[in-house]
């Protein structure tokens, strides 16, 4: 079978088709069940993190090494020639000449797309500002499939910061290809952006806006939590808004036994720690799944057949 992801840049989730996503999920399932330490043998991957990261950077590095590859790079753009004024384009040209692929996180929206225009090797976006985070979406899709046995026709709620949360933008776009039904629950000031809602309307995808989790809880298959970002509000306004979007054990009353809670992490106060002990909590397993999803993507991008 032809591998459509071979040597492909992965900058936005919209760069991937539904079959591409299904291929990554299936490959992640296989690698989780049957580890393969040879898929990146003799491959060298650059890990270029111009912005702070814990899970994304470490899971990519783990993924490369578990597949038998090698990784070089940096975790702080302040320690690179960017501090001397070197352009991103020049940096990526050089880094791409050393390696077989570049994984990059950058605080500026559009930086990953720019990097792909100057790189002779595939660029994988590890997050660019509040724009896109496609590999988070792939691990989210893998986690949803792991818990629900499918991706099609699910009821999915997004809670918290839907305006600036790049993970919810990417995931909503991806799941729209699987005819899911969406429930958006957020402060009015942090509502899902118009462009996402317009895309969903054009595709005929059902979605609705709600003030509380409780009113839709019995319908949900997936509850996707995000944090309300404190830095975007004054103290009084933040406390009022954040308190409305805290998930507690009592909030889960009436939930389907199979409903799972996801969160891109880090968690602050939006999920009470008591929820961790419920059968609905899946966010720590979700983070672990990041290794398998990123293994799958790297293997597909760097091998003609997998």
UniProtKB/Swiss-Prot annotation:
Q: In which pathway does it act?
A: Pyrimidine metabolism; UMP biosynthesis via de novo pathway; (S)-dihydroorotate from bicarbonate: step 2/3
Q: Which InterPro entries match?
A: Asp/Orn_carbamoyltranf_P-bd (IPR006132), Asp/Orn_carbamoylTrfase (IPR006130), Asp/Orn_carbamoylTrfase_sf (IPR036901), Asp_carbamoyltransf (IPR002082), Asp_carbamoyltransf_Asp/Orn-bd (IPR006131)
Record's keyword terms, sorted: Pyrimidine biosynthesis, Transferase
Pull one GO CC term from this UniProt entry.
cytosol
Q: Which superkingdom, per the lineage?
A: Bacteria
Per UniProt, carbamoyl phosphate binds at 55-56, 105, 133, 136, 265-266
Q: Which GO terms describe its biological process?
A: 'de novo' pyrimidine nucleobase biosynthetic process; 'de novo' UMP biosynthetic process; amino acid metabolic process
Q: Where does L-aspartate bind?
A: 84, 166, 227
A Pfam family per the record = OTCace_N
Listed EC numbers? 2.1.3.2
UniProt xrefs under SUPFAM superfamilies = Aspartate/ornithine carbamoyltransferase
Similarity section = Belongs to the aspartate/ornithine carbamoyltransferase superfamily. ATCase family.
Annotated function: Catalyzes the condensation of carbamoyl phosphate and aspartate to form carbamoyl aspartate and inorganic phosphate, the committed step in the de novo pyrimidine nucleotide biosynthesis pathway.
Q: Could you describe the subunit structure of this protein?
A: Heterododecamer (2C3:3R2) of six catalytic PyrB chains organized as two trimers (C3), and six regulatory PyrI chains organized as three dimers (R2).
PANTHER family linked: ASPARTATE CARBAMOYLTRANSFERASE, ORNITHINE CARBAMOYLTRANSFERASE, MITOCHONDRIAL
NCBIfam families given in the database record: asp_carb_tr, PRK00856.1
Q: What is this protein called?
A: Aspartate carbamoyltransferase catalytic subunit
């Amino acid at each position: 079978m032809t591998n459509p992801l071979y040597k492909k840049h992965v900058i936005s989730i919209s760069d991937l088709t539904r079959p591409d996503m299904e291929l990554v999920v299936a490959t992640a399932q296989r690698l989780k069940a049957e580890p393969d330490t040879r898929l990146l043998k003799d491959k060298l991957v650059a890990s270029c993190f111009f912005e702070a990261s814990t899970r994304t950077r470490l899971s990519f590095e783990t993924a490369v090494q578990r597949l038998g590859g090698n990784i070089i790079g940096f975790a702080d753009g302040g320690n690179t020639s960017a501090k001397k004024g070197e352009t991103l384009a020049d940096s990526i040209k050089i880094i791409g000449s050393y390696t077989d692929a570049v994984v990059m996180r950058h605080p500026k929206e559009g930086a990953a797309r720019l990097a792909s225009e100057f790189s002779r090797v595939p660029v994988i976006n590890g997050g660019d500002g509040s724009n896109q985070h496609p590999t988070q979406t792939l691990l989210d899709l893998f986690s949803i499939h792991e818990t629900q046995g499918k991706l099609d026709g699910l009821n999915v709620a997004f809670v918290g910061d839907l305006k600036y949360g790049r993970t919810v933008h990417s995931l909503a776009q991806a799941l729209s290809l699987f005819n899911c039904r969406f429930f958006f629950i957020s402060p009015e000031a942090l509502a899902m952006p118009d462009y996402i809602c317009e895309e969903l309307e054009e595709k005929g995808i059902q979605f609705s806006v709600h003030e509380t989790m409780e009113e839709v809880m019995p319908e949900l298959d997936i509850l996707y939590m995000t944090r309300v970002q404190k830095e975007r509000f004054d103290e009084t306004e933040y406390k009022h808004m954040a308190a409305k979007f805290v998930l507690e054990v009592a909030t889960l009353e009436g939930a389907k036994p199979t409903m799972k809670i996801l969160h891109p992490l880090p968690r602050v106060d939006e999920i009470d720690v008591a929820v961790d002990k419920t059968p609905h909590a899946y966010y720590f397993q979700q983070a672990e799944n990041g290794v398998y999803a990123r293994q799958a993507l790297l293997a597909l991008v760097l091998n003609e057949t997998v």
